[in-house]
Amino acid sequence: FRIPSPSMDPTLKTGDYVIVTKFSYGFGRQSIFDIPIIGDRIFWREPKRGNVVVFADPVTPRQKKLIKRVVGVPGDVIEVRDSLLYINGVMAERDYIGPGSSNADIETSGDFFLETFESQNGKPHEHVIWDKYPQALFDNFGPYTVPEDHLFFMGDNRDNSSDSRSSSLRAVHRKYVMGRAQFVLFSLNIEQTSNRRNKWNRGNPFRWGRFFKGIR
């Protein structure tokens, strides 16, 4: 799976090529063989909060695939207050890392934080997020209860991600889940030009440090 946008930056960067295991959550119509099955999935295993998942866009499932992080499972109440994430009334912890920057963006902006919340197994899950702008569009959202058989997704680049906070997506039904992103196989050094178009830096074509990089 090729990362087409910076919505999961800094975890995943534009130009990363990611290995996805399509058996992680059972099989459905979006799985490798696209075979007709009884119901929407077989051998379903629910993703855990914190998993990075590839899924089909419910509007155009055959044309567009998305990759985001699971922050809500069925029954969870999701809320965002002043950019802080709350799951079932508990605020996800944030620890400051440093100023945000990426070669996919023209300017350094915002800050990186280590975000921690509890997964279904009771263990804490940690990942880095990018909070770029004060009072951004989705800095306040909900509360929203995740419906049965649905998942709530958010991008790690919180102010530059169209995800379940958007009215055009909201929670995604499990039938659209394709698989779990496991690691970056290799990474092309894609930079964003002043008009926001992606350009491959042929003078320095690869991000060698991202080869075989695990995704957490």
What are the functions of these language-model segments?
Residues 1-8:
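Aromatic-capped interface at the extracytoplasmic side
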